UniProtKB/Swiss-Prot annotation:
Gene Ontology terms: biological process: bacterial-type flagellum-dependent cell motility
PANTHER family per the UniProt record, alphabetical: FLAGELLAR HOOK-BASAL BODY COMPLEX PROTEIN FLIE, PTHR34653
Pfam families in UniProt: FliE
Alphabetical UniProt keywords: Bacterial flagellum
InterPro entries per record: FliE
Keyword Hydrolase: no
Species this protein is from: Erwinia tasmaniensis (strain DSM 17950 / CFBP 7177 / CIP 109463 / NCPPB 4357 / Et1/99)
Keyword Lyase in annotation: no
Localization (cell): Bacterial flagellum basal body
Protein name stated in the entry: Flagellar hook-basal body complex protein FliE
NCBIfam families to which the protein is assigned, alphabetical: fliE (TIGR00205)
UniProt GO molecular function: cytoskeletal motor activity; structural molecule activity
CC per GO annotation: bacterial-type flagellum basal body
Amino acid sequence: MAIQGIESVMQAMQTAALQASGSKTDDASSADFGAEMKAALNKISETQTAARSQAQAFEMGKEGVSLNDVMVDLQKSSVSMQMGIQVRNKLVSAYSDIMNMQV
């Protein structure tokens, strides 16, 4: 799950780099960076919501919800959140570097 999120962010960054360098890409592969970031954030939110709801179902004693599944989903949620935080940190760092460049 986290690998797919990283791949989509990497694809968006590569597309932005190609557009900045003046290279042309075909319209099917180029995507708006903001849209890709929004999709990644929505995926993180969905993962957290699913993990929370499964944990609540386990706490209420619903049938078919095992502790193993709950723990795995909570860890997936945690890893995806950490990935999102690291991507944000890299974006802030890159923005800071660009703003500190002399023209």
